[in-house]
Amino acid sequence: MSIRIEIGERYVVTSDSFQFILHEKKRAESGKNAGQEWLAVVGYYPKLSQLVSGLMHHDILTGSAKSFADLNVQVEQLSKRCSEAFGSYGR
């Protein structure tokens, strides 16, 4: 059984029989697929807890926080999106 869980507008979690896969949504800017959405792999994780840690790490490093207060807000927002996404999965 594979899963597909969207986390907010930016991330998607999928799985295969061995691992969880974190993807970031991207949009092609040029070429014949301009404007189409595609999923870029951020990482492969054998445990869901490792995926959540990898997601937080990636979001922090690619985010726009300029202070610890900004970073706190960013982490809280992502935590809320994760809670909503994982809480609604399977309903």
UniProtKB/Swiss-Prot annotation:
It holds the Pfam family DUF5405. To phage 186 CP83. This is Uncharacterized 10.2 kDa protein in GpA 5'region. The gene is ORF83.
